[in-house]
């Protein structure tokens, strides 16, 4: 696993990340495990306005990353904005336990295992108002799990998305919550108003001992809390709520491995 510590503005940290990889002769776009098809490019372009409205800092970081890698920002956006909405596979699992004596939070990452040598642990120290956090990613910018300086921990699992819609996907939503929210209720409130591109679960835990699983899809969100079985929650690659009711495929859910290449 790679380890990075980044400090500065979002754009500065994006440039740091891209430039450090470039110094080692590594190009992010050479390691993408799927083709950047016309379908993916169209979906990413449709998602761009949602990021400009709800998470403009991510676009600034991607601008810096593209400069550091000497590549097109559009190509990086195509990778990131479609990874969970149009996934090549689903993976990961999470759990959290809160028993009054503390919180235990765990996550297993088995998404895109072909990229395992490139997995990265990142610590972000922002020079603006964003909350510092440390997290893990199989790619770049988006995070699969994170713990921030306010004590909020979040982990995702991917769920098949029958009808993707333009919006923010799992890893980017998690990243946004990690740098803007201090507790589970605040994160859930923020999540309810975001346009979502993909289906996913988000397992959340905070310093007060509050834990929850948010089952999220473009159609809505359900929150699961600890039940009679004990003070724990868990999630894998499916929903337990009625969000799991099958839907017919949408316009962006066709074959993804065909068409134009990178």
Question: Where are each of the predicted segments found?
Answer:
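Short, glycine/charge-rich beta-strand/loop segments that flank catalytic centers
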Residues: 74-95
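C-terminal, well-structured catalytic/ligand-binding subdomain of enzymes
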Residues: 1-71, 82, 99-104, 108-262
């Amino acid at each position: 696993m790679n380890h990075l510590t980044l400090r500065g503005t979002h754009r500065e940290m994006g440039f740091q990340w891209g430039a450090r990889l470039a110094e080692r002769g590594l190009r992010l776009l050479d390691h993408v495990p799927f083709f950047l098809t016309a379908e993916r490019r169209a979906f990413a372009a449709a998602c761009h306005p949602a990021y400009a409205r709800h998470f403009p800092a991510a676009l600034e970081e991607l601008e810096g990353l593209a400069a550091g890698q000497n590549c097109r920002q559009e190509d990086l956006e195509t990778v990131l904005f479609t990874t969970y909405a149009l996934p090549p596979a689903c993976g990961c699992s999470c759990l959290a336990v809160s028993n009054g004596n503390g919180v235990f939070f765990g996550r297993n990452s088995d998404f895109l295992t072909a990229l395992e040598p490139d997995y990265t642990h990142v610590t972000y120290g922002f020079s603006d108002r964003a909350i510092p956090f440390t997290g893990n990613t199989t790619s770049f910018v988006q995070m699969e799990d994170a713990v921030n300086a306010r004590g909020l921990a979040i982990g995702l699992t991917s769920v098949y998305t029958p009808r993707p819609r333009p919006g923010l996907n799992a890893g980017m939503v998690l990243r946004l919550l990690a740098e803007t929210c201090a507790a589970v209720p605040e994160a859930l409130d923020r999540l309810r108003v975001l346009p979502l591109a993909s289906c996913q679960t988000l397992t959340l835990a905070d310093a007060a001992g509050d834990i929850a699983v948010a089952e999220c899809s473009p159609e809505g969100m359900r929150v699961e809390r600890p039940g009679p079985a004990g003070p724990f929650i868990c999630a894998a690659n499916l929903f337990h709520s009625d969000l799991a009711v099958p839907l017919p495929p949408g316009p962006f859910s066709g074959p993804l491995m065909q068409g134009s290449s990178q």
